[in-house]
Amino acid sequence: MMTIAQIMEKMIAFSEGNVHDITHLSCVWTYAKTIGELEGLDADTQFILEVAAITHDIACPLCRKKYGNTNGKYQEQEGAPLVREFLADTGMTAVQIDRVAYLVGHHHSPAQIDGIDYQILIEADYIVNASESGYDQQAIRTFMEHTMKTAAGIRLTKTVFGV
């Protein structure tokens, strides 16, 4: 089976030199990995989380070409089938690929969170999006209070944004 590093390298190549996309996925992966480890995830859940974090925006290049934007709904719609194809030769099990595809296909739908891997992916992506887009303190505080559930995600958010 491919390692996380090999999947990361493959995703960087897939990103075709888009430095913003590569930096974003790298940052989301870093936060997801950190939160997952601090929360004590089992090895398989941690692996699935990290693969999902690396590939969560896999549909962005296609969405830019097809729709002219990277709207979250389009990302979810296009991302699940793309990630299945992307992961087909990694040696991951069908169950692992199914879960990653589910996470990628729902990563803009926090109301549907159904597991710790999904929760952490949402938290990690939010931290990075808030940083990249300069979300105001109140928006960050509101998200933290209403959507964040992990102690590690809340601690990191408080530390990063001073809320």
Label each PLM-derived region with a short phrase:
Residues A43-T45, Q96:
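Membrane-helix interface segments
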Residues Q46-G68, G79, A101-H108, D125:
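His-Asp-centered metal-binding catalytic motifs of divalent-metal-dependent phosphohydrolases/nucleases
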Residues F86-M92, D98-H106:
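Mid-chain, well-packed structural core segment of small domains
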Residues M1-K10, A53-A59:
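Short alpha-helical hairpin
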Residues V28-Y31, K73-D89:
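An active-site-proximal "capping" alpha-helix that borders the catalytic cofactor pocket
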Residues E16-C27, K65-E78:
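Active-site metal-coordination segments of metallo-dependent hydrolases
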Residues M2, A13-S26, T30-D42, T55, ...:
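Divalent metal-dependent phosphate-bond-processing catalytic cores, especially two-metal-ion Mg2+/Mn2+ enzymes
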